[in-house]
Amino acid sequence: MFSFVDSRTLVLFAATQVILLAVVRCQDEEDVLDTGSCVQHGQRYSDKDVWKPEPCQICVCDTGTVLCDDIICEESKDCPNAEIPFGECCPICPTEQSSTSSGQGVLKGQKGEPGDIKDVLGPRGPPGPQGPSGEQGSRGERGDKGEKGAPGPRGRDGEPGTPGNPGPVGPPGPPGLGGNFAAQMTGGFDEKAGGAQMGVMQGPMGPMGPRGPPGPTGAPGPQGFQGNPGEPGEPGAGGPMGPRGPPGPSGKPGDDGEAGKPGKSGERGPPGPQGARGFPGTPGLPGVKGHRGYPGLDGAKGEAGAAGAKGEGGATGEAGSPGPMGPRGLPGERGRPGSSGAAGARGNDGLPGPAGPPGPVGPAGAPGFPGAPGSKGEAGPTGARGPEGAQGPRGESGTPGSPGPAGASGNPGTDGIPGAKGSSGGPGIAGAPGFPGPRGPPGPQGATGPLGPKGQTGDPGVAGFKGEQGPKGEIGSAGPQGAPGPAGEEGKRGARGEPGAAGPNGPPGERGAPGNRGFPGQDGLAGPKGAPGERGVPGLGGPKGGNGDPGRPGEPGLPGARGLTGRPGDAGPQGKVGPSGASGEDGRPGPPGPQGARGQPGVMGFPGPKGANGEPGKAGEKGLVGAPGLRGLPGKDGETGSQGPNGPAGPAGERGEQGPPGPSGFQGLPGPPGSPGEGGKPGDQGVPGEAGAPGLVGPRGERGFPGERGSSGPQGLQGPRGLPGTPGTDGPKGASGPSGPNGAQGPPGLQGMPGERGAAGISGPKGDRGDTGEKGPEGASGKDGSRGLTGPIGPPGPAGPNGEKGESGPSGPPGIVGARGAPGDRGENGPPGPAGFAGPPGADGQSGLKGDQGESGQKGDAGAPGPQGPSGAPGPQGPTGVFGPKGARGAQGPAGATGFPGAAGRVGTPGPNGNPGPPGPPGSAGKEGPKGVRGDAGPPGRAGDPGLQGAAGAPGEKGEPGEDGPSGPDGPPGPQGLSGQRGIVGLPGQRGERGFPGLPGPSGEPGKQGGPGSSGDRGPPGPVGPPGLTGPSGEPGREGNPGSDGPPGRDGATGIKGDRGETGPLGAPGAPGAPGAPGSVGPTGKQGDRGESGPQGPLGPSGPAGARGLAGPQGPRGDKGEAGEAGERGQKGHRGFTGLQGLPGPPGSAGDQGATGPAGPAGPRGPPGPVGPSGKDGSNGISGPIGPPGPRGRSGETGPSGPPGQPGPPGPPGPPGPGIDMSAFAGLSQPEKGPDPMRYMRADQASNSLPVDVEATLKSLNNQIENIRSPDGTKKNPARTCRDLKLCHPEWKSGDYWIDPNQGCTVDAIKVFCDMETGETCVYPNPSKIPKKNWWSAKGKEKKHIWFGETINGGFQFSYGDDSSAPNTANIQMTFLRLLSTDASQNITYHCKNSIAFMDEASGNLKKAVLLQGSNDVEIRAEGNSRFTYNALEDGCKKHTGKWSKTVIEYRTQKTSRLPIVDIAPMDIGGADQEFGVDIGPVCFL
């Protein structure tokens, strides 16, 4: 219901209320001290009271100042006989006319209920605003004209507006005496009583008639209708006091009172309910690696996996081991002695001979597979310093150097007054994250996580235990003697006999077959090149060899002609899902996407390290003409008189025209941190920012734990080939899991890498001897023989790739104290201090040099796709892709033309050994041969084959341990032992042997069948191949013809003693036996005749062991024993002795870039380099942290008026509102237009003109805002510095003004001298003089500087500011003034009598010159470092004349912290005739 206020007024009023709060809050203290009341015509008014001293004048009290304004009446042309009511100013139409002319009666609202007011007479309140006229009374006599009011200030002339249309007469005004107008404005006219709800509008007024003469007083008329409110008339004489009227209706609620002081804290409330789950926080920094966890409990046994798909057929296995020995056959008939057999087959190969001498160096092998990339090496040593560069061009003058070292500390000053406790500082920058705290207790059981990915295949289970040996069968009855059995296996090695006497050298044996191939020895030294041998004779053609291994695929043939299109084949079955491809490397960055919307500002990061200095930029363009230089030194004045007292302030000049708006004020101090706001709703997802540059490679992560094994899923469809993923980091090795149950046999795997060498297994029990198999076909090449003896140490190999850096070993014992080290490097910069106050902008610097290339930023989010770029150059050939699914069968192609025969392929390198094939089926039994013709009786044979094995003798005594047998085959690896403690890092090992060849590649598709080639020439004989594997047994051949007698075979091994045979015919003398051990010497008996053999005696006791016989021939190689059970893991061995120092290896490859070392000491400054080319524009950086709050902006333009709101409920009564200054309306008027004709009819409400007291309050408010924007340097409205005053009021003269550099409350403003020519702010000293007298009597003859304030009795340090302000006020304000200034200066006048102040004319030097002490305790001298030296503008104290003279000293600096001067130390004092005094000039800041 603010219908009577212009919408522009409302907007301004609302805006200014906010400003008023800021202005008034600080002035509350002043209002309490000085109530700001006003007195006019002897009447006292409170601050912000509004009254009318005359009917046509309205005044407001504005903090002690009375502001009055004339009331201007609108002409009422439609009212012929308008009347001015008593006490009003403006004429109104009589009510009878309005009622008749309007044609409608004015409705009157219901009368309100009388208020419940106690009859207590209070003090007289200030007059309320004009109430509505009472009902028509009898007309009183005209009162005398009141005294003329004081003339008001002249207002500005407004431009004449276009006349508006006449408005209708408004309804009756609001009810009378309420509170002051501010309460009405807040509450609105929402009362139920009175005429506030009259909705009927008056008709237009008639034309105004001539004023008639006053008629005679009529009889009192009847009670008239309530009239419109009249303008204030001239006051009549006061009538007698009428009877007390009935209580009026309650006034409208006033404005809300000011907030009371905060109440005491309430008791702590009960804890609130559990809040909703918060949004996830930002990810924390990676924690420190935790302790190694304890091994987890064994998991429950998993369910049996689904049956695997049927595996492909395995490769053919190796020939099976010979079967067990068959049962003993029935004894055959005794045959006749046969004829001598053919020469026996070649005996088995002897044991491998000792390792031969190293062969000549073979040709260089094919290059090995590339090794895995080594980890980056350690940083290389710093290179030698390069040669001195050429002299560069002369650099520009450098920036001023840093201040020199502090001078010797002065004598301690007297204790200062303790400063007031400072306000608590703003929060510092967030510290870096702390170290991880101690390990917390285990948390509660978390929710079950989602199913993890399928784990990797577990390690193979431990080999099963060997089955128990079956029970021994019963001994069968001895059968009749069978044919001589085959030679038994070599018996267990007997106890080691004593060495026998050396026998005679035997005849040389036949050359043994080549032994198995030994492991390659280490490379021998290269031998001299041998002479070329003669070409051998071509050998005979051998029989046709078996099929060779398939050759390597030949070179591709020429493309054949296109075949006929075949008919499409049926679609093949769905292929298995291929394995996921390895993660590919990151693709190249895509083209830049369109500019995304600006993202939300990020969280403020920790401060980054200081970047390297950038390169100097290009020289800037020529600058504008500089500002006029500093004021020159004054010319020699005459002698300055002593300073006179300050003159009285001159009369205030006329107020000048309003200056242009001043610049924004300096930035205020940061406010105290606000209380945390409520959490905002989560914002919408921001548009992804631009892609950042690729980040640096992160550190290698730890290996993750293997996940639980998932159950087998159903077979998926063939997926499309995935994009190459990024390579994942290796997780740490998981703890060994428990052995799983043996799984079903899987298909054969690829050939694995060789396992670690297992510990020697326990010897297995000796196997039974198998039947002798038939000789197999020639086998494939044998496996490598056992490793040969270690060769001589070869030359040092090339450096291997650097291994990964091992974990740090345990700390060694502390070393002995070393010699004192060189001075350390300069430490890193400390953390940045809290943000200072913003200084004034400096002058533009020269462009800097181009900066170093920055480090790559972290990888940004992928940008939106950019426009299609041009096609790139073809990339390098990518790796072969995974085989795609089998395509549908193509149509039959036409027959191609016969291709050219391909070139003969190169002989392929032999492929790796194939997996052993499965055992072949046993061959069928050969046919029984026909019985041979009975031969003639042969010559007596040699000693018969040994008979069958006799029964076992009694066990012999335990022999000495035999020599170590050859190592058994590697047993299966035992279970993982517990981790030992970490050993000391060993020395680097020797270079390992060449690695095993890689896995076989996939088979190529078979080539087309080539045509038969023509016979080639016979090739030279190839080298002897290694013996092949034993082939399957062939069928027995046909029975051959009896061969001719062969040469006698070699002696067979001595058989075990058989049962005694029946007496045979006398044989030929046997071969001489080996000499037996010498028996005890007996009498030589005669040889008796050979008796007939008696019956078989019982088995005699075992004779004593004979001397060890000569070694028998090498027996056939036994079958491979079964793998022994795995031995337990042995204890860790003792640490070996340190080996000899190895030869130095060749230099390793370059290591990783080391961490940046600490900065070295600054080198000598090099000559400036040439100016580099200007760099490209950098990409937009990421949003910086939120800066400190900027300076307060200018007030915004007045916004458009809003629609009228709903009427609010009546508020509680408020205190009297503040006054308002009417001059605000000067800013509202529009110069081009007159007033809006409908300006008082905004909400279809009738209204009179704008209430005058609103205008008055606005005018007062406008003055206060203007003072904030353009301070006038008074104590009530101080400026920040004199420079601000000069900018706001350039026409003002130099003089004393008030400033408040630290802003805030104005109580601590200080009075200074403002030099309006230069804008300098000069603070007076207090006191400003040291009286002239003899201050010091020297005790010794030595003269030294004596500090006046510190040493001289009665001396004092100089202080500044006036006595009226609180102590330290000037010091606090000067601290801020220094921050706001860039230059400072001060003059000191030294009055002397027989005392040197500056130059000593007698000696011509400055040794006796006075010292000055700056406010930061620095000493300012007459000579020395130019930044700490003062000048003498006038020097009259050069010699002792017996008269008073003076020297004027000036010190100027851009280090504002050095001024003002706080003490002076003369040297040439102490004599009885030596006197001095000082005038301390003001310190001036600019």
Curated annotation (Swiss-Prot):
UniProt PTM comment: Contains mostly 4-hydroxyproline. Prolines at the third position of the tripeptide repeating unit (G-X-P) are 4-hydroxylated in some or all of the chains.
Composition-biased stretches (Gly residues): 233-242, 308-317, 422-431, 536-551, 1007-1016
Keywords: Calcium, Collagen, Disulfide bond, Extracellular matrix, Glycoprotein, Hydroxylation, Metal-binding, Repeat, Secreted, Signal
Ranges where the record places region Triple-helical region: 203-1216
Domain Fibrillar collagen NC1 positions: 1252-1486
UniProt feature, compositional bias: Basic and acidic residues: 110-121, 138-159, 253-267, 766-777, 1117-1131
Annotated site, Cleavage, chain positions: A183, Q184, A1243, D1244
Subcellular location, principal: secreted
Compositionally biased spans, kind Low complexity: 194-205, 220-231, 318-330, 337-346, 363-373, 393-421, 478-487, 498-517, 708-732, 891-904, 936-955, 1102-1116, 1150-1159
Residues that, per the record, bind Ca(2+): D1300, N1302, Q1303, C1305, D1308
Signal peptide: 1-26
GO molecular function, one term: extracellular matrix structural constituent conferring tensile strength
UniProt name for this protein: Collagen alpha-1(II) chain
